[in-house]
Amino acid sequence: VLSPADKTNVKTAWNAVGGQAGEHGAEALERMFLSFPTTKTYFPHFDLSHGSGQVKAHGKKVADALTNAVSHLDDMPGALSALSDLHAHKLRVDPVNFKLLSHCLLVTLASHHPAEFTPAVHASLDKFFAAVSTVLTSKYR
């Protein structure tokens, strides 16, 4: 559960990302594919090379979903319901992959925004990504 301080930290950190969210999403996906090669199996139709238009487009989708979640911190299950259905029923993504992407997102954000990435912000973003992952895997049961 995100505390009021966590919510403030998440909103502040995401605002710092600003118009770079799509680029950061794509970079996090690239990190995930390189660090955890088994995640590539969910994207057999993608060109997974560095700078790929398909990875950039999917990175923007990831970033847009996270922006939506940040805008609905008090109702993430409602805001992400359709995305949860998609990943659980159609795409059948193994839930562990959300943790892997969350880690790669944290690394990407820390590398681009070191001044804003304090220990408190790191902890709040980690809790936020865990909450998003929980929502996205809630329809698996």
UniProtKB/Swiss-Prot annotation:
UniProt keyword list: Heme, Iron, Metal-binding, Oxygen transport, Phosphoprotein, Transport
Positions that bind heme b: H87
GO biological process per UniProt: hydrogen peroxide catabolic process
Expression sites (tissue/organ): Red blood cells.
Modified residues (N6-succinyllysine): K7, K11, K40
Cellular compartments per GO CC: blood microparticle; haptoglobin-hemoglobin complex; hemoglobin complex
GO molecular function terms attached to this record: haptoglobin binding; heme binding; iron ion binding; organic acid binding; oxygen binding; oxygen carrier activity; peroxidase activity
Pfam families in alphabetical order: Globin
Binding positions (O2): H58
PTM sites of type Phosphothreonine: T8, T108, T134, T137
Signal peptide: none
Boundaries of every Globin domain copy: 1-141
Modified residues (Phosphoserine): S3, S35, S49, S102, S124, S138
Coiled-coil region list: none
PANTHER family: HEMOGLOBIN FAMILY MEMBER (PTHR11442), HEMOGLOBIN SUBUNIT ALPHA (PTHR11442:SF48)
Record's function text: Involved in oxygen transport from the lung to the various peripheral tissues.
Quaternary structure note: Heterotetramer of two alpha chains and two beta chains.
Family from the record: Belongs to the globin family.
Protein name: Hemoglobin subunit alpha
Organism: Eulemur fulvus fulvus (Brown lemur)
